[in-house]
Amino acid sequence: MITVDPSAEDNGLANMLATIMRQNVADHPERQIVLRGLRGRLAIFAEDAEVAVTWVFDAEGATVLDGIVGIPDLTIRGGFEPIGDMSRMESAKHPLLAHFPDPRGPVNQSMWRALRSGQLRIHGLPRGLPLLVAFGDVMQIA
């Protein structure tokens, strides 16, 4: 189950991300397995829009809250556009690497440039890498 907490009903980022996640799980039922396995807290802060959300993944499903709530296992900070681009990242074509980004994809190259320049920052790595990869897998529009 993917839920927008009442605290986040007026949060555009929360609604956008929840809509993408719901649509992706509906279009790709195999992602439901990945979603059920997610555990932890993921905070996303779109600095230019001054809006933040916290995803809580537990046995009940996924809930998106307004703001940064609790201590996140992983935090993504950056502009609204690079954060939105995370749903457009291209997966590797090889079956063994299908859950990982394709370094040759134009969106992935743009994301890499944003990471190198500091326009996009990810805190909580390497421990949070499984959460990041699984979240990316569920959110990827393909």
Model-flagged regions — what are they?
Residues 1-142:
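Feature captures hydrophobic
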